[in-house]
């Protein structure tokens, strides 16, 4: 069963996840893309523990297998909503093994620690995961040419 901890506790894994982000999202993080995986991960590992913040999943040997982040803004069509669960990634060999669910649960705990009552997520691919984990779809939008489904979840302490 994976262990989930804040990225700020193991910032040495930023380089590993930067490579994964560049391979998973080449239009954004790859050559010619607008994003910088290393800069985003550096921000997610901030030692103060405020937004943006990321959590990582480690396997039993302590190797990184997944990441998810909580940040202030995500897609430009929904700037009125905040904060956002973003940058969800699980290595291919660990997908469908509940790692994503553990990462989402840890993000909810981080949101609660930071005093948030609701968080949001935009996704094109993780719809079934979010639905299984109790998220509710509230909208849809096209972002960077891709249809995104907008979900929300009440932070448990705020229920």
What name fits each language-model region?
Residues 2-17:
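A short beta-loop-alpha structural element at the N-terminal edge
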Residues 16, 122-124, 140-159:
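C-terminal "cap" of GNAT-fold acetyltransferases
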Residues 52, 80, 85, 146:
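Short coil/loop residues immediately preceding or within conserved phosphate-binding loops
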Residues 54-56, 63-73, 84, 89:
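Conserved beta-strand in the GNAT
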Residues 87-90, 96-109:
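Conserved acetyl-CoA-binding loop-helix of GNAT-fold acetyltransferases
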Residues 111-124:
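Conserved GNAT acetyl-CoA-binding A-motif
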Residues 131-141:
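Conserved acetyl-CoA-binding loop of GNAT-fold acetyltransferases
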